[in-house]
């Protein structure tokens, strides 16, 4: 069972579950369904009918598909992904950190699943030979007024069961990060780095080898009760849900699990469920330290976070390829997949303004938003922040790097939804659907733990 049930009224009488508080490339498309990746699947007699369809080919969707098929090898399970490749968006545009679980409210889903998920990710990478580096992390207080918050964060980490935490002083900071200045820090030795896209593609390989099927280039535009015709009457009885794509194709299934990331609210609404909480896309821009300055950073270096926001602040992150990423900031993206500053989609912007509580959020945190926009526009402002930790960095040492877009759930009052949110519902369709509604960081770290929870709930809810 999912830990705590909270009922939220909606179109389908929604029941929301939350705690109170290298690369393997799949084979090309097969005939029949667009973008079908054959995996020796245990499909029904129709190649487009499945017991369970999972919407979303990111790391959470693929982990969930893998866990479900390993737990229920007799079921036919398919994953649908709107892109031509897997794990392209949030999974492929993050800093690659294996988080320890220190930041999250005790007893929350994030706290529980991150600690559990980190252990599972390390175990999985060891099993599969996927490269990672357990390089650790320092959370550094550079001002006296940050020390009480740092100490409180340390206590929170202990409550969450994070391994190996210790508070260290200036001399020990220098031993771990010779070029970093700070008054006090939390040493998190369990933090690591990995390529999550590679992990996700390995999940996909496991899923296909176990008999699952992946349908790429299948953008879901409808989740409906299947309409009967004489040729498919048997399918209609056994597979009552029709999942339709933007090209007019459909697949039939008994149950649906959605892991739609940036589109989780829209996919929920397609199934007749409550679109709240709404997704607001935040773009994060990274800088890259020039290679000749890579010696300045050994492991992850993070600031003491501001508890008012779910963002962890501009930080230093080593990558497996030897580069050092600096950032990200957090600014509103004017498109759900808007990786460039001037990417724009009118529908996405109007939904943020009219449907979410974004305007309230702006009024509540106006100065923070202005500061983030300023840092996005002026490189020198971000560098000034970085110099608080490593004074030797200059503006000539950094280059503009990649960007990612974070799907952040926001309620109607303008409050950022802090915890993971998973929805079920009641109704002809909603009884057969489970939604992953809010799964920002640390969802990649937590992906295997999340998948276990989804599999357990699917077994009980769908009586598998």
UniProtKB/Swiss-Prot annotation:
The modification N6-acetyllysine is found at residues 105, 174. It catalyses: (S)-2-hydroxyglutarate + A = 2-oxoglutarate + AH2. Its main location: mitochondrion. Pfam families: DAO. GO terms for cellular component: membrane; mitochondrion. PANTHER family: L-2-HYDROXYGLUTARATE DEHYDROGENASE, MITOCHONDRIAL. This is L-2-hydroxyglutarate dehydrogenase, mitochondrial. InterPro entries: FAD-dep_OxRdtase (IPR006076), FAD/NAD-bd_sf (IPR036188). Keywords: Acetylation, FAD, Flavoprotein, Mitochondrion, Oxidoreductase, Transit peptide. GO terms for molecular function: 2-hydroxyglutarate dehydrogenase activity. Its cofactor is FAD. One of its GO terms (biological process) is small molecule metabolic process. Belongs to the L2HGDH family. It is found in: Mitochondrion. Residues 1-52 form a transit peptide. Its EC number is 1.1.99.2.
């Amino acid at each position: 069972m999912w830990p705590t049930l909270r009922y939220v009224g909606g179109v389908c009488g929604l029941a929301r579950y939350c705690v109170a508080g290298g690369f393997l490339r799949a084979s090309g498309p097969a005939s029949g369904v667009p973008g079908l990746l054959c995996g020796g699947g245990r499909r029904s007699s129709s190649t487009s009918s499945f017991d369970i369809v999972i919407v979303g080919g990111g790391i959470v969707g693929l982990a969930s598909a893998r866990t479900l098929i390993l737990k229920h090898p007799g079921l036919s399970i398919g994953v649908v992904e709107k892109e031509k490749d897997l794990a392209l968006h949030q999974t492929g545009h993050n800093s690659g950190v294996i988080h320890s679980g220190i930041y999250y409210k005790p007893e929350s889903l994030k706290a529980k699943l991150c600690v559990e998920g980190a252990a599972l990710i390390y175990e999985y990478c060891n099993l599969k030979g996927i490269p990672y580096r357990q390089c650790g992390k320092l959370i550094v207080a550079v001002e006296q007024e940050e020390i009480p918050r740092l100490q409180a964060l340390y206590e929170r980490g202990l409550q969450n069961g994070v391994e190996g935490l210790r508070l260290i002083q200036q001399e020990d900071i220098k031993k771990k990060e010779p070029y970093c200045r700070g008054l006090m820090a939390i040493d998190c030795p369990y933090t690591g780095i990995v390529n999550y896209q590679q992990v996700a593609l390995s999940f996909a390989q496991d899923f296909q080898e176990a008999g699952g099927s992946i349908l790429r280039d299948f953008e879901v535009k409808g989740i409906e009760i299947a309409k009967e015709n004489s040729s498919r009457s048997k399918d209609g009885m056994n597979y009552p849900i029709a999942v339709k794509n933007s090209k007019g194709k459909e697949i039939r299934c008994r149950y649906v699990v959605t892991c739609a990331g940036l589109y989780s609210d829209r996919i929920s609404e397609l199934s007749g469920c409550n679109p709240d909480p709404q997704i607001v896309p935040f773009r994060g821009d990274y800088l890259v330290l020039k290679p000749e300055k890579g010696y300045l950073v050994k492991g992850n270096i993070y600031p003491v976070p501001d508890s008012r926001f779910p963002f962890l602040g501009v930080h230093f992150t080593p990558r497996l390829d030897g580069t050092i990423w600096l950032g990200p900031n957090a600014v509103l993206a004017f498109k759900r997949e808007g990786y460039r500053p001037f990417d724009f989609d009118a529908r996405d912007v109007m939904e943020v303004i009219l449907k979410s509580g974004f305007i309230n959020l702006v009024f509540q945190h106006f100065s923070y938003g202005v500061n983030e926009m300023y840092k996005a526009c002026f490189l020198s402002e971000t560098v000034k922040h970085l110099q608080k930790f490593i004074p030797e960095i200059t503006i000539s040492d950094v280059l503009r790097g990649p960007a990612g877009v974070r799907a952040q759930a926001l309620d109607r009052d303008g409050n950022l939804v802090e915890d993971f949110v998973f929805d079920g519902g009641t109704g002809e369709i909603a009884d057969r659907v489970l939604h992953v509604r809010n799964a920002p960081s640390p969802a990649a770290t937590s992906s295997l733990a999340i998948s276990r929870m989804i599999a357990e709930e699917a077994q009980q809810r769908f009586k598998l």
